[in-house]
């Protein structure tokens, strides 16, 4: 299998390492490739949209014609994992906790409402333990950096994991979104779960 | 995509050990001010949260701004963060006098108008400018040689803060000392406000050379190096294992064009700071967009070419040849 990581900006290297760790845990043979051009999108069986700045990733991906390409592929069933900025990119409804609605290029394929910078600024970034039983894992420590929150889901989008008053991981068919950073965690459970979606 | 042998979690475990070491030292009274970050869950301001933040800046461009209008231009161009200053480095150089942190009112205005992270600079060793910015809630503090140093001998002990710090460095020793003091991100010092990339290139090459030399040394000589750099041996070992700095390293100082940005990425930097280069040019909107495009796509000369075509060389800022600066006019030598 070939898994692509959108690699303009953000935690793309960390996702690549984590995907490789997850592959070796599951005894899968596969490759991780950087996605930067429309032609890269044709090569992959699944795609990760990393954490970073969603405005930056959106602006560059749109400029290079990758945004539309990915959107069409996701609509056709390409498995996708969006973390933090990636979750923002996937959401149909995005606003900022302080600044409100701002226009930015998005993929917008997932029936989730996301609020950017929900917990506040970097000072309010935190780490905590989450329970991953619902996807076959145990407790694992994860980090939330200037994290968004998933306020609600509709249609067949469902909440997988909640924390305090919001959803931090959601799923809809081929799409997975997390507001925390599984790529910086010791546990590879989220990436293992994502790879299992590609296998199907 | 560059891949390393260690995951973020493994690097992080090491930094927790370093932070514990700092705690032990301060508990024994060797440091005057002792850090106390409560570790209940969910935990804010942890080493993990501080080191994670710069990871999400990688591949991006951080732009110096002096007001809301400039900050909005930066955000719309795709900057990953802005650095709020009172004066751009070019103007600091021209105006002389003591350069201090920016007006908190302006920083606050910028924070309320854009969604990307907002950073600000403090003078080297100025704990209280840093405390003020932490209280204000900026996302990252730059302890910067571009401002006039407040302490000629010491840098801030950054383990004490919940807000992550970025520090400048010209070589591996400087970088490791700042990391040991708790910096979460390093940037090359370059020579700010000159529009001349040569010093940033020099510093990045020195860093690369010193890292590759370190890797080739036998263990006993690495011990010696750790003493020379005045850092724990474990930190030197971590660099050897990773074959790079253990935290995010950006290029800064003199970057003025998309090709400059791509050059610094090619030399191994994780991202770019652009100071005077954008808002001292005559085409800031286009130039900001072009530099962002080039930094993210540095492996592809055709895209860098496209970015370079978006700007016009006769609108670039007038550069200053480093050789024409007097030794006392150099900013990079402040705070080693």
Curated annotation (Swiss-Prot), chain A:
Pathway assigned in UniProt: Cofactor biosynthesis; pyridoxal 5'-phosphate biosynthesis
Enzyme Commission number(s) from the entry: 4.3.3.6, 3.5.1.2
Could you tell me the keywords of this UniProt record? Glutamine amidotransferase, Hydrolase, Lyase, Pyridoxal phosphate
User: Which reactions are catalysed by this chain?
Assistant: aldehydo-D-ribose 5-phosphate + D-glyceraldehyde 3-phosphate + L-glutamine = pyridoxal 5'-phosphate + L-glutamate + phosphate + 3 H2O + H(+); L-glutamine + H2O = L-glutamate + NH4(+)
SUPFAM superfamilies found in the cross-reference section: Class I glutamine amidotransferase-like
- What are the catalytic residues? 84 (nucleophile), 181 (charge relay system), 183 (charge relay system)
One function term, GO molecular function aspect: glutaminase activity
Q: Which GO terms describe its biological process?
A: glutamine catabolic process; pyridoxal phosphate biosynthetic process; pyridoxine metabolic process
Is the keyword Acyltransferase assigned to this protein? no
Q: Residues that bind L-glutamine, according to the entry?
A: 52-54, 116, 145-146
Q: Under the cellular component aspect of Gene Ontology, which terms does the record hold?
A: cytosol; glutaminase complex
InterPro entries per the UniProt record, alphabetical: Class_I_gatase-like, PdxT/SNO, PdxT/SNO_CS
Instruction: State its role.
Output: Catalyzes the hydrolysis of glutamine to glutamate and ammonia as part of the biosynthesis of pyridoxal 5'-phosphate. The resulting ammonia molecule is channeled to the active site of PdxS.
Q: Which family does it belong to?
A: Belongs to the glutaminase PdxT/SNO family.
Q: How does it assemble?
A: In the presence of PdxS, forms a dodecamer of heterodimers. Only shows activity in the heterodimer.
Q: What is this protein called?
A: Pyridoxal 5'-phosphate synthase subunit PdxT
Q: Which organism is it from?
A: Sulfolobus acidocaldarius (strain ATCC 33909 / DSM 639 / JCM 8929 / NBRC 15157 / NCIMB 11770)
Curated annotation (Swiss-Prot), chain B:
Record: active site:
121 (schiff-base intermediate with d-ribose 5-phosphate)
- Record field: catalytic activity: aldehydo-D-ribose 5-phosphate + D-glyceraldehyde 3-phosphate + L-glutamine = pyridoxal 5'-phosphate + L-glutamate + phosphate + 3 H2O + H(+)
CDD domains hit by this protein: pdxS
Q: Which Pfam families match?
A: SOR_SNZ
- What residues bind D-ribose 5-phosphate, as annotated? 64, 193, 254, 275-276
User: According to its UniProt record, in which pathway does this protein act?
Assistant: Cofactor biosynthesis; pyridoxal 5'-phosphate biosynthesis
> Which molecular function term from Gene Ontology is one that the record holds?
pyridoxal 5'-phosphate synthase (glutamine hydrolysing) activity
A single GO BP annotation from the record?
Answer: pyridoxal phosphate biosynthetic process
Q: What does this protein do?
A: Catalyzes the formation of pyridoxal 5'-phosphate from ribose 5-phosphate (RBP), glyceraldehyde 3-phosphate (G3P) and ammonia. The ammonia is provided by the PdxT subunit. Can also use ribulose 5-phosphate and dihydroxyacetone phosphate as substrates, resulting from enzyme-catalyzed isomerization of RBP and G3P, respectively.
* PANTHER family from the UniProt entry: PYRIDOXAL 5'-PHOSPHATE SYNTHASE SUBUNIT SNZ1-RELATED (PTHR31829:SF0)
Indicate the family of this protein.
Belongs to the PdxS/SNZ family.
Protein name, as recorded: Pyridoxal 5'-phosphate synthase subunit PdxS
Please tell me the species this chain comes from.
Sulfolobus acidocaldarius (strain ATCC 33909 / DSM 639 / JCM 8929 / NBRC 15157 / NCIMB 11770)
Question: Its encoding gene is what?
Answer: pdxS
